[in-house]
Amino acid sequence: QLNGETVYTACETNVFSLFSLLPGTPYTVAVQAEGETLTLDFTTEAETFFVDASRYGLVADGETDNTGRLQAALSTCPRGGTVYVPAGRYRTASLFMKSCTTLYLEKGAVLLGDNDRTHYPILPGVIPSENEVDEYYLTGWEGNPLDSFAGLLNITQVHDVVVTGEGTLDCDAQNGDWWVNPKVKRIAWRPRAVAAVDSENVCLHGITVQNSFSWTIHPIFVKHLDLLNFNINNPYNAPNTDGIDPESCEYIRIIGMNIHVGDDCIAMKASKVFLGMKLKRSCEHTVIRNCLLDKGHGGIVIGSEMSGGVKDMVVTQCLMDHTDRGLRVKTRRGRGNTAVIDGLVFRNVEMRGVKAPFVINMFYFCDPDGHGPYVQCREAMPVDEYTPKLGSLTMENIVATDAQFAGCYFDGLPEQPIERVTMKNVTITFDPNAKEGQAAMADNRPLVKKLAIYAENVKNIKLHNVKIEGYEGERLRFANVGHFEED
């Protein structure tokens, strides 16, 4: 109830949104469940000005180019103001937010991406300074600072920005050439649906983002990032259309998301070796909870672009439904000694039909040299400045049903084994009709089916109340595992 009026009944989720609230107004929310009532009093933030974008001459026919009109509304919005976009279909190319403003997309409002790539500005990957020493990184492609088209919505070097409402950002990529030969650079690399760079206090909430050109939500060097209770929808066969890819960001909250994509649902990143080792900016202090992760390649993924490191991440109360892998860590030699993954906790997670629930792969065959001997050699190589490291991973209170390939597949480097894997109260059940497949994307690894727990090159493994049902062969298949404990 909101101020005594019922707004939701029979809710199946415990993250929900309230829209069309008045600014600077006190409210009381009451939630009733199982005979108990909880209340919360709050006051909405004040608003300086309400800017109706339709007054800027918008044409809502889905064909007319509205880029200039929409950008005029965003650029002239006063500090603390809201740009309101009413229902309608508005064709547009790249838009840029400014600090201390809100973009509100009304229900039925659709910002529809321009299908002509020549209408999108190109953002330089690197801008040199006058002293020719410092550099400014404006965009990137798969972990490197390469020239790319600006996104449909850009949040660049700003602060205190909110994008909210029940409207839609539709890149309309299926009707352009964005998914044709996706690995080929044409003029510049593909844009993102929402690109945020070098910004602080950024919040996306409530909206739907769909049919992205490539990665959907791609924040780089963003501090205090909230992604709250909105939808990401991309076709399963759409190439490289990850859902959320925070890169070298800090203090991230990803809560109540519904993600249906053609690649990884959420992938935590920290650049490739050039930027990772130069800037040493990790992705850290992340909370992911109450999210639905549906039919992507991976549910929660770390890497493979992670040369700056990924640390201090907690994932809880999430549902992964028919993703290829559940928890997926992917790295390789060459990411650098700054590529440290540590302090990852996964708890209270359910997986349904996930083919390989837990995969740690330090032989991931990405990049042009990914199949070469340096990456794929199974013999120990010298530990040097290019050797990545995996620290502590904890998984507890997890149920995975209808797995197929492998329940747990942990493949560390012989020269730098995985430091510690702890599993507590974990149950994995295999699909009786499971088909064999590749648990981890590495060379010279056999196809597997109903493989319970495989571990190679791991220093410490601790299992407490870990149940595997319906597996074939040995329950534990270990090679070069140091200390093992099970109770």
Residue ranges and their predicted role:
Residues Q1-D487:
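Extracellular/periplasmic carbohydrate-active domains that bind, remodel
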